[in-house]
Amino acid sequence: MPIKNLLKASLAGAALLALSFTGASAAPSIPCGTAKLIVPWGAGGGTDVIFRQMVDKVNKNGAKPQLQVVNVGGQGGNKGAKQASKAKPDGCTLFAIHQSAITSYFTGRIDITWDAFETISMVTSTPSIIGANVNTPYNNISELVAAAKKAPGTITAGGTFGSTSQFVFLLLEDATGVKFKHVSYDGTKQRMTALLADNIKLGEINLAAAIKFIKAGKLKALGVTNDARLDQIPDIKTAQEQGANVIFAVERGVVAPKGTSAEIVKHYAKMFEGAAMDKDFKAAMHLSLIHISEPTRQDR
């Protein structure tokens, strides 16, 4: 199956997260004083940073139970996904998810699909940056494509195999006809470290993690995968402007184990919607180049 079709299938599942349940209801009985939100990557990555800020806002808003981020890294996010899918559906375990949960299924790395979870809410949408080490000779996607065509399969691109960070480069290959040499790293932090150290030439970087290095001149931004330039970094062209038809964003949301009651799902959806729509939280996310996805109510 072509890469574009695989990604479309994963995004179709991600779209379900937008159907959050937010009707008013009495607080359900949840048998824990603190519920855990499993983040399936290590501390310091984009998903971890986003959800720690969101959990902080949820807790300050008086969440019952209070939430605690628990990092379960390993296997490119699959270890945490497996643990979350097997958790008791009593409201004491939630899972921070994005498309990698499905792209890993398509590549045979995991047997879990969206059907293993109850959807609570879409939270953020984050376009990717095609990043390059500062010592590379190319300064934009057009120059990168030209270089890759001259030396197919030699330019190293870092990303977790089977995850969104690799799929960005597979989409770029599909759109331009080039081939990269893919190198796997287990998470954003490891990939960023390798990119800055010139161990790899390219890396998909989320905007929250990349902007400080770009502005400091420690990382090149060859292009963004948004459909329009970003106002925070307006000089960086989109991939489409440079002749590569690639539009992509990491869609992050919250789910619960399959079988979690509708009352508990509604309870958490309301909590996350309140945090996501908070003006201070939205401002903080905007500074990190992260778009807040407003939950879509079923009764609208």
Predicted regions and their residues:
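N-terminal (or domain-start) structured segment
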Residues: 27-116, 154, 161, 177-201, ...
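A conserved helix-loop-strand patch within extracytoplasmic ligand-binding domains
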Residues: 116-157
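A ligand-binding cleft/hinge motif common to bilobed small-molecule-binding domains
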Residues: 99-109, 171-175, 201-236
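Periplasmic-binding protein-like
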Residues: 150-154, 273-288
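C-terminal lobe and pocket-closing loops
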Residues: 125, 139, 210-277
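Single conserved hydrophobic/aromatic residue that forms the stacking wall/gate
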Residues: 291-300
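Short, low-complexity disordered leader/linker segments with a strong preference
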Residues: 1-32
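Beta->alpha turn/N-cap motifs
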Residues: 95-101, 159, 188, 205-210, ...
